[in-house]
């Protein structure tokens, strides 16, 4: 059923061709209208004052003023849900991670003939993300400071020791900025491994893992097929691969594979969480954080049935209360906590689990 009031979107891109593609995609949905366009950051700032759009799609690389600088100004003066439009390149990935830290809600891949994603799938993703962004509570719309890296966090790569306990974390929309807060607070001596699924395309997960590694006392890396899961390390599922944990020669080992998408995504958290529950049993903590959809809910059930401990982010601090809500509705969540308590709750849960 169409909304009573259309979602008004401003499209910002220096390419007239790209603005046309995005306009056509957005206006193919009856609930969305493109209220205005801008060719660069300066024009975007001028138009956001007068047009007051509900959502902005913002290119990163533009002349005069780039997307990051425009984002910082908009979030500080005219807080509006912003979705970054990012090239699927390493530079694009790194800039996008910065944008999410500064306050962008989400990002979409820039449509092009070279990207390996069909147009219908891309259309559905863009429209879904714009609709979710339009619902984001105003309290989340603000310029955030990027974390300054402490010299004390320069850490030696720990010698590998196979983990006997594990924390399985699922996150999607709003996840990157929220996970940074969690990882910043976790101790370096966790005596457990972390397995993390954050819905992101290839390349972006590597940049995100590197960013987490820089702000965390734990060692964080993008997972590789066949590597042993070690304690005090965190493994981020790479974009476009499902990640599971299996036992190989008695050691927990990463398995990556390109199976069918689950809940429309790859990587998906459910197969990862179920596999962690199988390998680690009651020595598992499951965590579901902000994101749209219901990925992670089945994983929470699997972990609880094996005797593990389960945690979900609360509604008030979730940028999108979809995945945590689905997890909570299973009736299998032990602790529903705000974002700033997730790290402490993980540590507390691990204290209850045998080493």
From Swiss-Prot:
Enzyme class name = hydrolase
User: Which residues carry out catalysis?
Assistant: 172, 199, 295
The disulfide bonds in this chain are none
> What is the protein name stated in its UniProt record?
Protein-glutamate methylesterase/protein-glutamine glutaminase
Look up keyword Phosphoprotein and say if it applies. yes
One GO BP on record is: chemotaxis
Name its species: Thermococcus kodakarensis (strain ATCC BAA-918 / JCM 12380 / KOD1)
* Subcellular location field: Cytoplasm
Response regulatory domain: from which residue to which, for each copy?
A: 8-125
MF terms from GO for this chain are: phosphorelay response regulator activity; protein-glutamate methylesterase activity; protein-glutamine glutaminase activity
Q: Tell me its family.
A: Belongs to the CheB family.
Its keywords, alphabetically, are:
Chemotaxis, Cytoplasm, Hydrolase, Phosphoprotein
Biological classification of the source: Archaea, Methanobacteriati, Methanobacteriota, Thermococci, Thermococcales
Name one cellular component (GO) term: cytoplasm
Q: HAMAP family from the entry?
A: CheB_chemtxs
């Amino acid at each position: 059923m169409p909304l009573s009031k259309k979602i008004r979107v401003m499209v910002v891109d220096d390419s007239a061709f790209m603005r046309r593609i995005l306009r056509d995609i957005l206006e193919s949905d009856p609930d969305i209208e493109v209220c205005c366009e801008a060719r660069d950051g300066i024009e975007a700032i001028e138009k956001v004052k007068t047009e007051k759009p509900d959502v902005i799609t913002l290119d990163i690389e533009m002349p005069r003023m780039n997307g990051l600088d425009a984002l910082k100004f908009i979030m500080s003066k005219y807080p509006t849900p912003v979705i970054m439009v990012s090239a699927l390149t390493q530079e694009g990935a790194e800039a996008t991670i910065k944008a999410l830290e500064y306050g962008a809600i989400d990002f979409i891949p820039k449509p092009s003939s070279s990207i390996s994603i069909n147009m219908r799938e891309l259309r559905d993703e863009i429209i879904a993300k714009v609709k979710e962004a339009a619902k984001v509570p105003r309290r989340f719309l603000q310029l955030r400071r990027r974390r300054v890296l402490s010299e004390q966090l320069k850490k030696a790569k720990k010698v590998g020791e196979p983990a006997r306990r594990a924390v399985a974390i699922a996150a999607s929309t709003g996840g990157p900025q929220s996970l940074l807060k969690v990882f910043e607070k976790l101790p370096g001596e966790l005596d457990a491994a972390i397995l993390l699924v954050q819905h992101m395309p290839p390349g972006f997960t590597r940049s995100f893992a590197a960013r987490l590694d820089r702000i965390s006392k734990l060692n964080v890396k993008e997972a590789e097929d066949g590597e042993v899961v070690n304690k005090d390390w965190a493994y981020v599922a790479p974009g476009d691969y499902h990640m599971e944990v299996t036992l190989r020669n008695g050691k927990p080992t990463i398995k990556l594979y390109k199976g069918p998408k689950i809940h429309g995504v790859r990587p998906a958290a459910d197969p990862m969480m179920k596999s962690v529950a199988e390998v680690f049993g009651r020595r598992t903590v499951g965590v579901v954080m902000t994101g749209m959809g219901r990925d992670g809910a089945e994983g929470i059930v699997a972990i609880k049935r094996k005797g593990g401990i389960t945690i979900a982010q609360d509604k008030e601090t979730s940028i999108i209360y979809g995945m945590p809500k689905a997890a909570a509705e299973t009736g299998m969540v032990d602790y529903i906590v705000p974002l700033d308590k997730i790290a402490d709750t993980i540590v507390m849960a691990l204290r209850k689990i045998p080493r």
